[in-house]
């Protein structure tokens, strides 16, 4: 199925590219998420007329994401208190939702889907490096300190 991309899609293309994808991928993900439209003659003409607007909107979201990434990097560290045993192991774990809530409480709005844990959930006390993907091209990094309650 031929589609016109309205946004940058990983491993597929960027704004304005006409790509051939499987019909299910287009119907179930790309079109409902607003990332693509079917490449009909009418849609191609409509897209060419709105190309400048879409490029400006894409640049605006990219600059907003870069600003959020700078704010996350400026935080440097976030401290999370959790119950732990004598050897420094946590009772339970700290996942993406807990980290997103802590960063949001510190002043930068972050969703749990933007949190990337390279080594899985946090199960020990101490310093842990956490990555954030605030946009498909923009990444940020933060140090999370887990302390015992």
UniProtKB/Swiss-Prot annotation:
InterPro entries found in the cross-reference section: Ribosomal_bL9 (IPR000244), Ribosomal_bL9/RNase_H1_N (IPR009027), Ribosomal_bL9_bac/chp (IPR020594), Ribosomal_bL9_C (IPR020069), Ribosomal_bL9_C_sf (IPR036791), Ribosomal_bL9_N (IPR020070), Ribosomal_bL9_N_sf (IPR036935)
Protein name: Large ribosomal subunit protein bL9
GO molecular function: rRNA binding; structural constituent of ribosome
Gene3D superfamilies in the record: Ribosomal protein L9, C-terminal domain, Ribosomal protein L9, N-terminal domain
Disulfide bond entries: none
GO cellular component: ribonucleoprotein complex; ribosome
Recorded coiled-coil stretches: none
Pfam families cross-referenced by the UniProt entry: Ribosomal_L9_C (PF03948), Ribosomal_L9_N (PF01281)
Role played: Binds to the 23S rRNA.
Keywords: Ribonucleoprotein, Ribosomal protein, RNA-binding, rRNA-binding
Family to which this protein belongs: Belongs to the bacterial ribosomal protein bL9 family.
GO terms classed as biological process: translation
SUPFAM superfamilies in the cross-refs: L9 N-domain-like, Ribosomal protein L9 C-domain
